Curated annotation (Swiss-Prot):
Top-level taxon of origin: Bacteria
Keywords linked to the UniProt accession: Cell inner membrane, Cell membrane, Lipoprotein, Membrane, Palmitate, Signal
Family in the record: To E.coli YafY.
Positions in coiled-coil regions: none
Organism: Escherichia coli (strain K12)
Transmembrane segments: none
Record's protein name: Lipoprotein YfjS
Positions of N-palmitoyl cysteine lipidation: C21
Pfam families the record matches: YfjS_YafY
Subcellular location: Cell inner membrane
Topology term for the membrane: Lipid-anchor
Length: 147
């Protein structure tokens, strides 16, 4: 019984791993078709899963995955040892760089969270390092996403 179970478990684990790789590749293909809000275009920097070095995701209670931050392996022009960071809004189908002209070294880790303005109800995405706010980015709605 044990001899039959072990190969079956290995087969299941391998197929799950391979399907997860396919899902990530499919996710990147879908994201590359999202509306780019500001340059540089996501598809110009990321073409395959190996181009992404780190991912951060926020999951909504009702809608599932809502926001993702993707840290790329490519450095902006004139920035040695830095990375591009992209904010992906899965709900609105938009993508935009977190920092267009800011060079962040690879050893700096950012923390992220979403904030809603209590008066205007606009959504913002804040990123910080060591508890210090580094930036705030408006999360706009995408009119192309409306049916």
């Amino acid at each position: 019984m044990k001899r039959k179970t072990l190969p079956l478990l290995a087969l299941v684990a391998t197929s799950l791993f391979l399907s997860a790789c396919d899902d990530r590749s499919d996710d990147l293909k879908a994201i590359s078709k999202f509306k780019d809000l500001t340059p540089p275009r996501f598809s110009d920097v990321v073409s395959r899963q190996d181009d992404v070095s780190e991912e951060w995701s926020q999951v909504g209670f009702s809608s599932g995955l809502t926001l993702q931050v993707l840290r790329t392996r490519e450095s902006p022009d004139g920035c040695e040892g830095g990375s591009y960071y992209y904010l992906v809004d899965m709900e609105e189908k938009t993508v935009q760089p977190l920092m267009n002209a800011l060079c962040i070294a690879d050893n700096i880790k950012l923390e992220y969270h979403e904030v809603t303005d209590p008066y205007t109800k606009e959504k913002y995405f804040e990123y910080s390092h060591d508890g210090k706010l580094m930036g705030r980015l408006l999360i706009p709605s995408n009119p192309d996403n409306r049916e």
